[in-house]
């Protein structure tokens, strides 16, 4: 199989994840929406390229006519490493991906969707250290006590989640840092994912 471009890898990963989560492949329109394409036609062109490389089969006449090939089952896509996140952009936007690591997503429970490089020492008391790669399961809701990747206004942070009414507290695991208080009546907060594991700094570089 010929090597895939980063964009093709991203689309193939999206297809696999959608099948794993819902039991069916995404439509062209869903691919376009999730990856920021202007139209479903752009997604179709990438799907044709993946078909030529033997990763998928395209079945005409149905919006979900995408099937993974047996050959592709042997390909390890790896996980995208997210770097700096631009304000207002989806965390998994292609421009945020620094590189891909050959890590099995299913070694984490639940399975990881991406890696985030840890900056700072605010979570050091639970072993999340500067420079570590945090494995993250993409989700939009969290329970009290979970360690999450959250976007507060335009800043992305890793903290322990606590919700009390309309107020959310993001707690550090380091006595030097005060909790971040977010009043949902006047501030915005988005849960980007749940921390599911750590790859120690340098272990995979």
Curated annotation (Swiss-Prot):
Q: Does the keyword DNA repair apply?
A: yes
Query: Some GO term, biological process aspect, for this entry: which one?
Result: proteolysis
Please, which domain of life does this record's source organism belong to?
Bacteria
Q: Which InterPro entries match?
A: LexA, LexA-like, LexA/Signal_pep-like_sf, LexA_DNA-bd_dom, LexA_repressor, Peptidase_S24_LexA, Peptidase_S24_S26A/B/C, WH-like_DNA-bd_sf
State the reactions this protein catalyses.
Hydrolysis of Ala-|-Gly bond in repressor LexA
Enzyme Commission number(s):
3.4.21.88
SUPFAM superfamilies, A to Z:
LexA/Signal peptidase, Winged helix' DNA-binding domain
Which Pfam families does the UniProt entry name for this protein?
A: LexA_DNA_bind, Peptidase_S24
Where is the site Cleavage?
A: 87-88
Per its record, what are the GO molecular function terms? Answer: DNA binding; serine-type endopeptidase activity
Catalytic residues at 122 (for autocatalytic cleavage activity), 159 (for autocatalytic cleavage activity)
Q: Its quaternary structure?
A: Homodimer.
Q: What does this protein do?
A: Represses a number of genes involved in the response to DNA damage (SOS response), including recA and lexA. In the presence of single-stranded DNA, RecA interacts with LexA causing an autocatalytic cleavage which disrupts the DNA-binding part of LexA, leading to derepression of the SOS regulon and eventually DNA repair.
Name of the molecule in the record: LexA repressor
Its encoding gene is what? lexA
């Amino acid at each position: 199989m010929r090597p895939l471009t980063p964009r093709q890898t991203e689309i193939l990963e999206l297809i696999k994840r959608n099948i794993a989560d819902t039991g069916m492949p995404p439509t062209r329109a869903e691919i376009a929406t999730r990856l920021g394409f202007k139209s479903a036609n752009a997604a179709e062109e990438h799907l044709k390229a993946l078909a030529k490389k033997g990763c998928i089969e395209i079945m005409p006449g149905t919006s979900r006519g995408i099937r993974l090939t047996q050959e592709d089952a042997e390909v390890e896509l790896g996980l995208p490493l997210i770097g700096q996140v631009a304000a207002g952009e989806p965390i998994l936007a292609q421009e945020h991906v620094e590189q891909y690591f050959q890590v099995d997503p299913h070694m984490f429970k639940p399975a990881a969707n991406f890696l985030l490089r840890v900056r700072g020492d605010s979570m050091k008391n639970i072993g999340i250290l500067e420079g570590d790669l945090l494995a993250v399961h993409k989700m939009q809701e969290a329970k009290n006590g979970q360690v999450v990747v959250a976007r507060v206004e335009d800043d992305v942070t890793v903290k322990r989640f606590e919700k009390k009414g309309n107020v959310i507290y993001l707690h550090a695991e380091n006595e030097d840092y005060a909790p971040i208080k977010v009043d949902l009546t006047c501030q915005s907060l988005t849960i980007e994912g749940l921390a599911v594991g750590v790859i120690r700094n340098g272990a995979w570089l």
